[in-house]
From Swiss-Prot:
Interacts with ITGB1, ITGB2 and ITGB3 (via cytoplasmic tails). Residues 357-453 form the PH domain. Transmembrane segments: none annotated. SMART domains: B41 (SM00295), PH (SM00233). The gene is Fermt3. The FERM domain is not correctly detected by PROSITE or Pfam techniques because it contains the insertion of a PH domain. Belongs to the kindlin family. InterPro entries: Band_41_domain (IPR019749), FERM/acyl-CoA-bd_prot_sf (IPR014352), FERM_2 (IPR035963), FERM_central (IPR019748), Kindlin/fermitin (IPR037843), Kindlin_2_N (IPR040790), PH-like_dom_sf (IPR011993), PH_domain (IPR001849). This is Fermitin family homolog 3.
Length: 665
């Protein structure tokens, strides 16, 4: 028993004194001194600490933090010897859940209690559960950017901070609905207002504030954002986060699974807001026509939100709608397909055959587009000088599996081009296809996109891909104005109530156009979306965002093995992209589907990847830790394993196996 003494007061056992500070990591904090042995269990030490403090309160959330090892002592049955704790250990007895300030994708601020002792993956899952966001594996936390000191100190506007620190959810129990919202949000007017902030789009930002926000001016600037992601396998305490720190909650992985407007109002709104701010802060580029479409959708969404027409379904209707959908699905399954139709679908390989104009950029050439007879079959594109030569050898044949597909479209100028970057031994071979009209462009663009992923036009998603492309093009078409009306919008939209165009477009368009030039163009584009409901408009905005060439690419500055210059590595949900830092051109693309394995050498901070056909790639990271690249690759592979049948069940162990690392503190 610890603390045995002789008659003179000397200790005769192997016990020793252990000092534990009470509270958070403060050298001035109150401390207690305990008499322990190496065989003392952590649970017994916790009990002694509470007895020494001698204060009645709920201590169930408290645990011991070992400062030198940056480790929580959570295994209460372990002894001090097993942990390796000696008398010089700096230990702190404090709460595991502490307040943090979150800046959400909609740029609003929220204060809540988060776990500082669990891996970040679990912490984010708990935060998303509190905020009613499904599929938390798509999100993560990143550090807020450091504020630069300004020569002239400006008073920053005060922000409303929604407080959820007192909201506690029972573990393992799904939140119930009450009055159309999760029950824990209906406790007070403040929490109800917080739910409306989460689930409803925010008004357009102040144009002056928008101009003052930092914006990336180059690819290296875009790499800075992705250097701030926190490690998913470590807790907040291990990463130097303190109570009250500001963190950003963002969608990290651009692979959105089972997005259902009925069950995902918060997730849908926050995803829309992240897309909107990506465009407004120029994190992602778009053309002038596309910006007008995005501005028109924002204007429409803002109008519906302000009018209160948020399209909420009554709780009684929700079950009926679900029942109708289930019956419709059952009807489709029961109808099935005729045996002859199924046989045709198995034996017939879809093809595209048509005249297209083709251009292959080469050095020291002035040749432009030339017309060819083009045949698209499986994932292969072949072109001939004329239709008569088609059965013979083609002028050139290209396998588009693993290629980059980039749209080059100007609807008003009737320009419908597809830029293909096809992998070749020398790098990426560039070729342009010019289509005659929207219908032809949509069919060939959809075929190219599927082929780049190794899929053919027989894939069930081909028809929906064509329709999505046509829908996006229709948004960019000028609204139904009569001849000569030009820039004068007709109907109730003419006064443009509440329309400040500078709050709807990126700053580079603010500099290029005056407000009186932007307003009629936005209203003209608005005529194409004026009939959409709020949910439909948000979904259309997200779909248009997803169709942009640079969508879903996270940038990291790296140096490839054997190279003397820095380059950019783009990470998407299905591929890695090597980009020339000087000109921004794609040099090479590697598909995850062709990847055999990847390894990280934490000592020299190098990532090595092996692909099919004995292709090996190795690089060191310059702008961020190699852990971030490792986690992106593992995270996207994990997300590709999700299945609808499993619902929202997550294999956390698999995620941590794919993304966890052994980098030293």
């Amino acid at each position: 028993m610890a603390g045995m003494k002789t008659a003179s007061g000397d200790y005769i056992d192997s016990s020793w004194e252990l000092r534990v500070f009470v509270g958070e990591e403060d050298p001035e904090a109150q401390s207690v001194t305990l008499r322990v042995t190496g065989e003392s269990h952590i649970g017994g030490v916790l009990l002694k600490i509470v007895e020494e403090i001698n204060r009645k309160q709920d201590w169930s959330d408290h645990a011991i933090w070992w400062e030198q090892k940056r480790q929580w002592l959570l295994q209460t049955h372990w002894t001090l010897d097993k942990y390796g704790i000696l008398a010089d250990a700096r230990l702190f007895f404090g709460p595991q859940h502490r307040p943090v300030i979150l800046r959400l994708p909609n740029r609003r601020v929220l204060r809540l209690r988060a776990s500082f002792s669990k891996p970040l993956f679990q912490t984010v899952a708990a935060i998303c559960r509190l905020l009613s966001i499904r599929h938390p594996e798509e999100l993560s936390l990143l550090r807020a950017p450091e504020k630069k000191e300004k020569k002239k100190k400006e008073k920053e506007p005060e922000e409303e901070v929604h407080d959820l620190t007192k909201v506690v959810l029972a573990g393992g129990v799904a939140p119930t609905l009450f009055r159309g919202m999760p029950a824990h949000f209906s406790d007070s007017a403040q929490t109800e207002a917080c739910y409306h902030m989460l689930s409803r789009p925010q008004p357009a930002p102040d144009p002056l504030l928008l101009q003052r926000l930092p914006r990336p001016s180059s690819l290296p600037d875009k790499t800075q954002l992705h250097s701030r992601w926190l490690d998913s396998s470590r807790c907040l305490m291990q990463q130097g986060i303190k109570a009250g720190d500001v963190l950003w909650l963002r969608f990290k992985y651009y692979s959105f699974f089972d997005l259902d407007p009925k069950t995902d109002p918060v997730r849908l709104t926050q995803l829309y807001e992240q897309a909107r701010w990506d465009l407004l802060t120029e994190e992602i580029d778009c053309t002038e026509e596309e910006m007008m479409v995005f501005a028109a959708l924002q204007y429409h969404i803002n109008k519906l939100t302000l009018s209160g027409d948020v399209g909420e379904l009554a709780s009684g209707d929700l079950g009926l709608d679900d029942l109708d959908a289930a019956l419709n699905n059952l009807e489709v399954k029961l109808k099935g397909s005729a045996p002859s139709d199924m046989l045709d679908s198995l034996t017939t390989i879809p093809e595209l055959k048509d005249h297209l104009r083709i251009f292959r950029p080469r050095k020291l050439t002035l040749k432009g587009y030339r017309q060819y007879w083009v045949v698209f079959k499986d994932t292969t594109l072949s072109y001939y000088k004329s239709q008569d030569e088609a059965p013979g050898d083609p002028t050139q044949q290209l396998n588009l599996k693993g290629c980059e597909v980039v749209p080059d479209v100007n609807v008003s100028g009737q320009k419908f081009c597809i830029k293909l970057l096809v992998p070749s031994p020398e790098g990426m071979s560039e070729i342009y296809l010019r289509c005659q009209d929207e219908q032809q462009y949509a069919q060939w663009m959809a075929a190219c996109r599927l082929a780049s992923k190794g899929r053919t036009m027989a894939d069930s998603s081909y028809a929906s891909e064509v329709q999505a492309i046509l829908a996006f093009l229709s948004l960019q078409r000028a609204g139904g104005s009569n001849g000569g009306s030009g820039n004068k919008p007709q109907g109730p939209e003419a006064p443009a109530e509440g329309l400040n165009p500078y709050g709807l477009v990126a700053p580079r368009f603010q500099r290029k156009f005056k407000a009186k030039q932007l307003t009629p163009r936005i209203l003209e584009a608005h005529q194409n979306v004026a009939q959409l409901s709020l949910t439909e408009a948000q979904l259309r905005f997200i779909q248009a965002w997803q169709s942009l060439p640079d969508f879903g690419i996270s940038y990291v500055m790296v140096r490839f093995k054997g190279s003397r210059k820095d380059e950019i590595l783009g990470i998407a949900n299905n591929r890695l992209i090597r980009i020339d830092l000087a000109v921004g051109d794609v040099v090479k693309t590697w598909r995850f589907s062709n990847m055999r394995q990847w390894n990280v050498n934490w000592d020299i901070r190098q990532v090595a990847i092996e692909f099919d056909e004995h292709i090996n790639v190795a690089f060191s990271c310059v702008s961020a830790s190699c852990r971030i690249v490792h986690e992106y690759i593992g995270g996207y592979i994990f997300l590709s394993t999700r299945e609808r049948a499993r619902g929202e069940e997550l294999d956390e162990d698999l995620f941590l196996q794919l993304t966890g690392g052994h980098e030293a503190f």
